[in-house]
C-alpha cells in the first residue's frame, strides 16, 4: 500500500470518526428540556434533570408531561425506570415529592414561602435513570386541547403511555440500549402490567424504537377483585385490630367472601370490622391521621376538584372510607366500569389522613412551573395531587393473566408490599402471587437491610418475587426510604434481595 493511499485512508477514518461524534452529540437529550435550577434548592444537581411535554396526538393537542432524572451513578449504563403513581388520576410527582425523588422537602418557616429542598440520600436516581410521568392525560400537568380525551380507561392509558415511551426514547436516543423497567404503586397495579404488555406486543410487532424491556415492579398494587376484596378482614385480624370472636363471626356470616358483601348478617358483621378500624390511617396503621379542620373555602380550593362532586355507592361511609385511598380505590376499580373518585365516595367529608400541602404549594408556584417547563396555571389549571377531570373506566379486567403472560415470557417481576398498609393489604398480594402456581425456588425468609430484618420475601420460578417491607405503609419509600432503595437496587441489578 502506497503512502498516499495510507494518508487518504487515514483522512477518511478521521472524517468518519468526527462525523460519528457529531451524530452522537446532536442525537441526544434535548437541551430545551434541561432544568438548570429550582427555586428552594441551593447547590448543584448531582445529575442532569429534564422535563417537558411529549405530544402523542397532534390533532387533539394531547400532551403528556414528564420529569426525567439521569442516574447519579452511571447514566449511560444504568437502567431507565418509568414511575407511575396510581389513582386513577394521581400525579407521579407524588412519588417525586414524597417517596423517592432527588429531594427532601422541608416545610418553610414562613407562610407563603416555598419549601426548602435538600438532596435525598435514598433517591432512586442514585442507581437508575428515572422518568416520572403524569398519566393519563388530564393528570398533573398533562393535558389535551380536546376534553374528550379526559374520558379514558386502562387500555387507552396503556396505549397512550406506550406512545409516550416511543417518542421519549426518540428524544433521548442515548438511553435506547439501557435496560428498561416499569414501576408504580396502588392503581398502577393496573397501569404497570397493561403498559408492560403493550411494550412487549410493540417489540414483537417490530415497532421502533425497540424498547430494551427487562421487567417491572408493583408496590401495594391492585390486581384482582376477589384477591383484593378478600384481603382486608384477614389483615385486620392478623394485625390484632379485630377480636377473634368478630373474625369468626364475620367469616361465618360472609362465608369467607368479603369481596361481595351479601346478606344483612354479613353486612352487619362487616360493618363492625369497619367500626373497629375506621379511625386508623388506612395507608399505614402505625401512623397518625392528618385531619383537615373543615371544608372552608380555602380547603376546598386546595383539594382536587374531583373531591367535590361524586358519591355513588350504597355502602355506608365507614366502608366507603376503607375501600378508597390516596392512590385510590381498592375494591371499586377492579369491577368493570367507571372508577369513582374521592368526591363521589365521601361527598362533604374530607379525605382521611392525607396532607399534600407541600406538593400543592410547590408545584403551583409560578417560578417552579417555569423552571420545570409546564404550561401556566391560566392555560391548564392548578396542579392537583389527584385530578378531578377524568371519567376513568376500568376495562382491563383482572391483572392475574397479565402477570402470568409477562413472567412466562421471561420478564422479571417484583411485587412488593408495605406490611402495615390497610388500603391494599399485603395479604391480597401474597395470595394472588401464590395463586399463579409457580414453583417456590426461594423459600419464605427474612431479607436484610442495614444489618436488620427489613421484611420477608418468597421467590418463585419464572422470575417472580414477592416481598414485604416491615413497618411500611401504602407508599413504601415514604416510610422506609433506605430499605426501599436497597431492594430496588438489588432487583435492578438482578441480585438476590
UniProtKB/Swiss-Prot annotation:
Its EC number is 3.4.16.-. Disulfide bonds join 90-386, 254-266, 289-353. GO terms for cellular component: extracellular region; peroxisome; plant-type vacuole. It holds the Pfam family Peptidase_S10. It is an enzyme of class 3 (hydrolase). The keyword NADP does not apply. A motif (Microbody targeting signal) lies at residues 495-497. The active site is at 186, 421, 474. InterPro entries: AB_hydrolase_fold, Peptidase_S10, Ser_caboxypep_his_AS, Ser_caboxypep_ser_AS. SUPFAM superfamilies: alpha/beta-Hydrolases. GO terms for molecular function: serine-type carboxypeptidase activity. Residues 1-29 form the signal peptide. Glycans are attached at residues 111, 146, 249, 405, 463. One of its GO terms (biological process) is proteolysis. It is found in: Secreted. Keywords: Carboxypeptidase, Disulfide bond, Glycoprotein, Hydrolase, Protease, Secreted, Signal. Ubiquitous. Belongs to the peptidase S10 family. Probable carboxypeptidase. This is Serine carboxypeptidase-like 20. It comes from Arabidopsis thaliana (Mouse-ear cress). The lineage of its organism: Eukaryota, Viridiplantae, Streptophyta, Embryophyta, Tracheophyta. The gene is SCPL20.
